[in-house]
């Protein structure tokens, strides 16, 4: 019975570690993925660099 508890605990720790490491990886790499240029056809930037709609 003790061996079953140990293996269950090990499985829980492994799953928790994988989830935490996946979350940390997503947070660290997200800032490098989301750089989108701010100049589609209907948008212009003002002097401060803020996107403005032009109709």
From Swiss-Prot:
One GO CC annotation: extracellular region
Disulfide cross-links: none
PTM summary: Contains 1 disulfide bond.
Keywords assigned by UniProt, alphabetized: Disulfide bond, Pyrrolidone carboxylic acid, Secreted, Signal
Location relative to the cell: Secreted
Entry comment describing in which tissues the protein is expressed: Expressed by the venom gland.
Top-level taxon of origin: Eukaryota
Signal sequence region: 1-31
Entry keyword annotation includes Disulfide bond: yes
Modified residues (Pyrrolidone carboxylic acid): 32
Coiled coil regions, renumbered to chain: none
Identification of the protein by name: U17-myrmicitoxin-Mri1b
Organism: Manica rubida
